[in-house]
Amino acid sequence: MNESGRVEAFSDGVFAIAITLLILDIKVPKADGPGGLWHALGAQWPSYAAYVVSFLVIGIMWVNHHQVFSYVARVDRALMFLNLLVLMVVAAVPWPTAMLAEYLREDRASHVAAAVYSLVMVAMALAFQALWWHLTRTGHLFDPRVDAPAARATRIRFALGSLGYPLTVGLAFVSAPLTLAAHGLLALYYGFNQVPVPTREAAAPS
């Protein structure tokens, strides 16, 4: 296994653990009778909503992480530390997810929980952006397929896409459910608009 393969394998393990931990916060409700169980299941909708959104966030982050590292031929010390920074935030996602699910239906507490959740998402976006900027700074870590100057030119586009995350911190003090929905939409945006890794084959005229 090459250097980048070891980093990616370790990262896959962290992503897998973080995404699995999300379901552990959805508890089996206690209720008397079938009707009571349906009511108890419905009352847990904040946990379901928070689980789905955070699953999308981590899952799509993993897809983009895999997309980027499939073009990385070698790693340096800075890249390893930046990748650890990304993983540190990913591993933290179950915590604000559980907090937001717990307080989503409350008034003032829901705003604080949504703001904390949004701040974690901001940290994740900044960490991944720092990793991408380091990779594209010189391009020497990419394999020969990558058009390094073209990859470097995507940094502004990538940064513009991250501007939505700080806005959700302000939205958190307006509506916690809307904040959660906004993070779901941002995750879907990055799901359909993956991190661009321009290759020489794609740039070559047909």
Swiss-Prot record:
Which reaction does this chain catalyze?
Answer: K(+)(in) = K(+)(out)
Q: Which GO terms describe its molecular function?
A: identical protein binding; potassium ion leak channel activity; proton channel activity
Report the locations given in the UniProt record: Membrane
Indicate the principal place this protein occupies in or around the cell: membrane
Which segments carry the region annotation Short helix H1? 31-34
Highest taxon of the lineage: Bacteria
InterPro entries from the entry? TMEM175-like
* Ranges in the topological domain labelled Cytoplasmic: 1, 71-76, 136-147, 193-206
Q: How does it sit in the membrane?
A: Multi-pass membrane protein
Task: Tell me which residues are marked as the site Hydrophobic filter residue 3.
Answer: L24
Keywords, alphabetical? Ion channel, Ion transport, Membrane, Potassium, Potassium channel, Potassium transport, Transmembrane, Transmembrane helix, Transport
Q: Which GO terms describe its biological process?
A: potassium ion transmembrane transport; protein homotetramerization
Motif RxxxFSD motif, residue range(s) on this chain: 6-12
Q: Where is this site: Hydrophobic filter residue 2?
A: L21
Task: Kindly report every residue range on the membrane side named Extracellular.
Answer: 26-44, 103-110, 175-176
Pfam family, any one:
TMEM175
* Gene Ontology CC annotation, any one: membrane
**Function of this protein?**
Potassium channel.
Question: Per the entry's comment, what about the domains?
Answer: The six transmembrane regions are tightly packed within each subunit without undergoing domain swapping. Transmembranes TM1-TM3 are positioned on the inner circle of the channel tetramer and participate in inter-subunit interactions that are central to the assembly of the ion conduction pore. The RxxxFSD motif within transmembrane TM1 coordinates a network of specific inter- and intra-subunit interactions with other conserved residues on TM2 and TM3 and plays a key role in the tetrameric assembly of the channel.
Subunit organization: Homotetramer.
- What this protein is called in its record is Potassium channel B446_29190
